[in-house]
Amino acid sequence: MSMKDNIITIDGPSASGKGSLARNIAAHLNFDILDSGLLYRVYAYLYDCGLEHSKIVSHIKKDIFFKTDLNGLTIQDGKEDITGDLRSEKTAKAASKISSLKETRSNLLELQRGFYSSKGLVADGRDMGTVVFPNAKLKIFLIASPEVRAKRRYLELQNRGQEVNMLALIDDIKQRDLKDQTRVLSPLIPAEDSVVIDSSEMSLDEVLSFTKKLTKRKLNK
């Protein structure tokens, strides 16, 4: 893969703010966006519905539709809206588990790379800068303390009307971190040429402002 001047990768642990940053930077630059975590959730959802590994990617290409409007992003399996199922903690845990399998990661690799277009791409996930787009021009590794990330997730789930326990969220995040960082395939580590941003004491606006300066310097955009 050649050096891509218009690919930005944003990696980091669960609830570090990758998605919010990716959406804002993509809108700022008018780039396409790849939410790889959402793809893994779709994969896990379809697997739990009984589809075999060998059939999931073709099903995603043919029957999964991503729609964005004033109300945000919705995902449909055919005509069925599965957005709520994908955003649940149950699917999040299933995605975390299935993402450690070689077959899953291999199946999704080319699908993820297929999101690239000459328009430009912001890709967020856990191995975007190390595995999927290793030659991206700008790589960001976004982190925050488990406590800060748990608070963000707590507020997010509360806004969806879900009952959550803060201590349980902190423990869950720490366990996911350990699993992501120690897995054999595509462990959660910053790329050697990535810029590490600790957002523990930063607002989204502050992280966004800093990232815009990086894009100006690295991509001249």
What name fits each language-model region?
Residues 15-16:
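ATP-binding Walker
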Residues 37, 79, 108, 122, ...:
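Residue-level signal for inorganic ion chemistry
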Residues 8-10:
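Hydrophobic anchor at the beta1->P-loop junction of P-loop NTPases
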Residues 67-72, 76, 105, 112-118, ...:
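Small-molecule kinase domains that catalyze NTP-dependent phosphoryl transfer to phosphate-bearing small molecules
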Residues 19:
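Walker A/P-loop
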Residues 83, 90-95, 99-160:
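ATP-dependent NMP and nucleoside kinases share a basic, alpha-helical "lid"
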Residues 27-89:
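N-terminal phosphate/diphosphate-binding loop that engages ATP/GTP or pyrophosphate donors
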